[in-house]
């Protein structure tokens, strides 16, 4: 098994606490409204805290797929949220799991900076595919921007 680590950062005009609430606390309701590809989010196991497993159903390339999302840590006081993709038909065969450690911090003019560390655990001696990595980054950036756009269009959401 190989472990490959990547870091990324995104900026947003949305305040950190409001963005965190949409991305974490109200994610099951907000994300399917904001992100066109995600059809639904349902809790498969758990109460929303660490250990909870959620099923995200999405449409990618015209196909309906799903991934299993396991919550690893929730730290509302420090605006941190860690989770892993642990299964589903949306996970490449060469990957055991993908872990995300996320944190929101104050950005310019009352906005946010989203920081993420991504750890990809591969099966056997498989290497992450560079094209898959670029595509995953593009999906992550589009996801973050979709949430920002939704919140900008819905100023009543607090």
Curated annotation (Swiss-Prot):
Protein residues bound to Ca(2+): 32, 35, 38
Subcellular location per the Swiss-Prot or TrEMBL entry: Cytoplasm, Cytosol
Enzyme Commission numbers on file: 3.1.27.-
Residues binding trans-zeatin 2, per UniProt: 60
BP GO annotations: abscisic acid-activated signaling pathway; defense response
Amino-acid positions noted as binding trans-zeatin 1 in the UniProt annotation, renumbered to this chain: 8, 83
SUPFAM superfamilies cross-referenced by the UniProt entry: Bet v1-like
Keywords of the record: Allergen, Calcium, Cytoplasm, Hydrolase, Metal-binding, Nuclease, Pathogenesis-related protein, Plant defense
Broad class of enzyme this protein falls into: hydrolase
Pfam families per record: Bet_v_1
List of residues binding trans-zeatin 3: 69, 81
GO MF annotation list: abscisic acid binding; calcium ion binding; cytokinin binding; melatonin binding; protein phosphatase inhibitor activity; RNA nuclease activity; signaling receptor activity
Any one of the GO CC terms: cytosol
InterPro entries found in the cross-reference section: Bet_v_I/MLP, Bet_v_I_allergen, Plant_def-hormone_signal, START-like_dom_sf
Superkingdom of the organism of origin: Eukaryota
Function: Class II ribonuclease (RNase). Binds to cytokinins. Interacts with melatonin.
Family per record: Belongs to the BetVI family.
Protein's UniProt name: Class 10 plant pathogenesis-related protein 2A
Source taxonomy: Eukaryota, Viridiplantae, Streptophyta, Embryophyta, Tracheophyta
Gene: PR10.2A
């Amino acid at each position: 098994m190989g472990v490959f680590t990547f870091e990324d950062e995104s900026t947003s005009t949305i305040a950190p606490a409001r963005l965190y609430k949409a991305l974490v606390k109200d994610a099951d309701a907000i994300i399917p409204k904001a992100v066109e590809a995600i059809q639904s989010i349902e809790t498969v196991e758990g109460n929303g805290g660490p250990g909870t497993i959620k099923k995200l159903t999405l449409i990618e390339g015209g196909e309906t797929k799903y991934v299993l999302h396991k919550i690893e840590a929730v730290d509302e006081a420090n605006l941190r949220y860690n989770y892993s993709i642990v299964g589903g038909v949306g996970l490449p065969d060469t990957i055991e799991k993908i872990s995300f450690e996320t944190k929101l911090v104050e950005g310019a003019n009352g906005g946010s900076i989203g920081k993420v560390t991504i750890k990809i655990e591969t099966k056997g001696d498989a290497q992450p595919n560079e094209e898959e990595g670029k595509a995953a980054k593009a999906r992550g950036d589009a996801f973050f921007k979709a949430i920002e756009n939704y919140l900008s269009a819905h100023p009543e959401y607090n």
